[in-house]
Amino acid sequence: MMDKTPALPPGSVIGIIGGGQLGRMSAIAAAKLGFKVHIFTQSATDPAVDVAHNVTIASYNSTNALKEFAQAVDVITFEFENIPSDTLEYLTHDCSQYCFIRPSIYVLQTTQDRFKEKTFLTSQTSIPLAPWCFVTEQTSLSLAVEKLGFPFILKTSRNGYDGKGQRYVRNLEELNTAFTNLTPHPLIAESVVDFACELSVMVVRSHDGILRCFDTVQNYHWHGILDMTLAPAPLTENISTEAQNIARTIAEALDLIGIMGVEMFLDRTGHLLVNEIAPRPHNSGHWTMDACPYDQFDMHIRAIAGLPLPHAVRHSDAIMKNLIGPEDMALLPRVLQTQGFIPHLYGKSIARPGRKMGHVNVLFPFGSLPGSLGIRNTLGVLATKTALEK
């Protein structure tokens, strides 16, 4: 379904629910296009607060604050999808008359719940997934063991990110422990994919149905957290194009307005399996900030504001390396001295273990992304803790 609403003029207010680094970088992109940004978040120390024109500090469950926020902005978007269900219902029924909500509440409700997401992909598309089961109690848990066999991964249906909310189970003892410790129920049991690599595609769709895809990229994770992205993925053109087509299919089926990250596995037989969907800017799209004329944040703001979408092209190959926790931040002086490193820091004051503090992009001439040894040499000081070393 196409939305024929007019484009927002400069000076309009973009409302962003969530105050993390994705909201921060979205706000900066909005300012470049002449928009003001109003952040709704629960903490005054969140990264996006520093760059916003207006800020509401309130609980995501505060209906009064949500209503005032909706009345003060021209469009609402989201920097994370794990927003309380009651909040989404209130926005749908009590706030949609005040402003646009992009992407739609339906998109968030579908993608914030693994069961709903997998059911949607199975029923609305022909896109392949790893075998999975819905687990509500011990009986369905036994059926999952029978269907999937060990090992498999047990996951919470909601609030899983950066490796949280899941356990790798190899036997009944580990399974029973995981079933008890993972909350809330219900859970998802999912087969372990013997994958050759992990990929993702950023796809953006406008209010009038125009679709743009950035290049397919390859991702490396370290303890469940994205460590590094290679753009473009060093794969055959056929596989890269297939991954983009999968992302397009999902965006169309969701009637998406805005940007979305689609994470996939490439298995060892050459088949692609969708892993997760994130209807927002995504960590694996940060390479676009320096390797493309229009990055993922520019494209998202353009889409939700009803502006024309340029083509999602890159002028350079790129490595994106996350700066995670106190170990990486201790290297910051050397990072800042390294020629060719383009740092992006998120303004977080405390570097806790596993916390994303920023990222570094490194560019190469188009078509000249190095191999593993060249990547290690390029990253230098940052190569001492990288997924390539696993």
Language model: regions and residue ranges:
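Peripheral (often C-terminal) accessory segments that flank ATP-dependent C-N-forming ligase machineries
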Residues: 1-3, 10, 302-390
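Anion (oxyanion) recognition and catalysis
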Residues: 31, 92-95, 122, 146, ...
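Active-site "cap" helix and flanking loop/linker of ATP-utilizing ligase/carboxylase catalytic domains
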Residues: 241-262, 268, 278-326
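ATP-binding N-terminal substructure of ATP-dependent carboxylate-amine bond-forming enzymes
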Residues: 1-112, 116, 139
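Protein kinase-like catalytic core scaffold
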Residues: 212, 260, 272-276
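Short acidic-glycine loop/turn motifs at beta-strand connectors
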Residues: 205-210, 267-270, 364-366
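Active-site nucleotide/adenylate-binding loops and adjacent lid/helix of ATP-dependent enzymes
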Residues: 110-200, 204-223, 227-250
